[in-house]
Amino acid sequence: MTARLKLRQLETALNEVEVFETPKVLLEQYPTRPHIAACVLHTIETSYGGLDGRIVADLGCGTGVLAVGARLLGARAVVGFDIDPEAIETAKSNLDDFGFCNEDTEGFCDLVLCDVTQTYTTLFDKECEIGRTEDYSRFSGVFDTVVMNPPFGTKHNRGLGLFLLFCTIIGKNS
């Protein structure tokens, strides 16, 4: 399979993605470096055909480097999930800067402010952290590919397992 961009082109583009000004250590906001993001995404596309024309979720999207990269490699739709409203704003800005949020742009981008570690219950309770009712069951089995750089539990001993659980709920082939 061939990717829309060569690995070096993807990495160069991802170097333009704005990162956290002040990462929140308690949320384990360690950035995914452009080189790592490019290698991971390029491998997903060239080895598995997992991005071009696909619907992709980015769990713990942070500033959106994986979401931007997925769109650059041809993802039809990308939905980023994060607990931090500032990260969501930065991710939106990054997606806007690359022209992925325009109505004229082919494809779709969205960002969901939520705590993925609480989503196992909120899938059924329909409660969202941003003060509106959200039906998370609509995401069940929707995504072709799920990408993430989750918290690994170095500050709070929780997160990774719940991120993986959410992957099994929202992914088509989990």
Could you say what each language-model-derived stretch is?
Residues 63:
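Conserved SAM/SAH-binding loop
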Residues 1-57, 68, 72, 90-141:
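S-adenosyl-L-methionine
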Residues 77-82:
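Conserved SAM-binding motif I beta-strand of class I
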Residues 162-173:
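A short glycine-rich, Lys/Arg-flanked "PGG" loop and its adjoining helix->strand segment in the class I
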Residues 86-87:
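Conserved short alpha-helix immediately C-terminal to the canonical SAM/SAH-binding motif I
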Residues 60:
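Conserved glycine-centered beta->alpha loop in an early N-terminal alpha/beta scaffold
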Residues 144-157:
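A short SAM/SAH-binding and catalytic strip from SAM-dependent methyltransferases
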